[in-house]
Amino acid sequence: MAHGLTPDRRAAGIRDVTPEYLRDMGVCGVIADLDNTLALPDAVYPTEDGAAWLASMRQAGIPVVVVSNNSFARVEAFCRPLGVDFVHKSGKPFGRGIRRAVEKLGVPRERIALIGDQLFTDVLAASHDRILCILTEPVVMETGYFFRFKRAVERAVGRKRRE
C-alpha cells in the first residue's frame, strides 16, 4: 500500500489502468479521482480515455466510485449521466470520503485501488487509508500559479523518492 507520498504504481494515464492490470494486482474495486484523471478540470464530460476506461470497468464488472473534493453539483453533473456512484466534498487527503467510497464499493479494502493524479491529495489519501495507489499523469497541466507551484513540488518530491 502507498506510504506517505510514494504511490504503489504509476501510469501514463487512466487508459493504461486496464481491468487485466487491476485483476493481476488482485483489485476488484476502484476509487477514481475526477478532475485531471477522468476529465479535464471542471468538465462535465469525461475525456475520451476517461469514457473508454469507465466503459471497460463496467464491462469487466469492476465497480468504480468517483471521489472528489468538488461540490455535489459538480460531481453529480459528471457522474449521474454515466451511472457512476460518487462521493463529493471528500476531504482528500483525509479519510472521511475515502471511507465512504470503500463502504459504497462493498469490497475489502485490500482489494481496492485508488487512481488519481496528485501526490498531496490522492496518494496521501490512499496512504492514510492503506489502499493501493496508482498515480497517473494529469490530463492537462493547470496554468495557475498555485497549481504550477504544487506540480513543481510534486515533481521534486517524486524525484527524491525515486532516488
Predicted regions and their residues:
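Asp-based, Mg2+/Mn2+-dependent phosphohydrolase catalytic module
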Residues: 2-32, 38-44, 48-163
